[in-house]
A protein has these predicted regions:
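C-terminal accessory subdomains/tails of enzymes that are appended
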Residues: 1-172
Length: 172
């Protein structure tokens, strides 16, 4: 609490609650979920997500990002490089906006970082080669991967995921 008092005083922020009662960034209380989901759907639709995917994409984004979910899609709409990217990643049904957000706001710089730490794609039972290729393309477009390194990065990640996690990559 003493650190909070010092830092907040320096920043000119009011202290609202004690540490144990303060909301964490992205925290979404159940009573706020419906409003956040509604706003996320609206922003996702404006960002180009196909109508038939909006419900699933919104639920996934709110589940992963909490109250930051609408910002994921707003960030995509403000990113000039992202304008040339498709709205969904491969055949995953996940929004390209999430990968762009992870790169721009969470400093994801590699395929492994996107898959294992940012988008949590290591956990669903199916991960396709098409999804890996699209993620690599997003990294290229965003300037994090050289075009010549795209295919080697995908092949290296496939081997890594198989060796470390026993993850089979679907090629269809």
């Amino acid at each position: 609490e003493e650190s909070v008092r010092k830092v907040f005083a320096e920043l000119g922020f009011p202290i609202i609650d004690k540490n144990s009662q303060r909301v964490l960034p992205g925290c979404l209380y159940e009573e706020d979920r419906e409003a956040c989901d509604s706003r996320t759907k609206n922003v996702a639709a404006r960002s180009g997500i196909p109508e038939e995917s909006i419900e699933a994409v919104s639920q996934w984004a709110v589940g992963l990002y909490g109250r930051r979910a609408p910002h994921v899609f707003e960030n995509m709409m403000q990113c000039s490089q992202a304008a040339m990217l498709p709205p969904l990643i491969g055949d995953s049904g996940l929004p390209t906006a999430a990968a762009v957000f992870a790169i721009e706001q969470e400093w994801a710089l590699s395929l492994g970082d996107l898959i294992e730490r940012r988008l949590m794609l290591i956990f669903p039972p199916q991960l396709s080669l098409a999804t890996l290729h699209d993620l690599a393309e997003i990294l290229v477009v965003m300037g994090c991967l050289q075009p010549a390194d795209r295919e080697p990065a995908v092949l290296s990640e496939v081997k890594y995921l198989q060796d470390l996690y026993g993850k089979k990559i679907v090629t269809q």
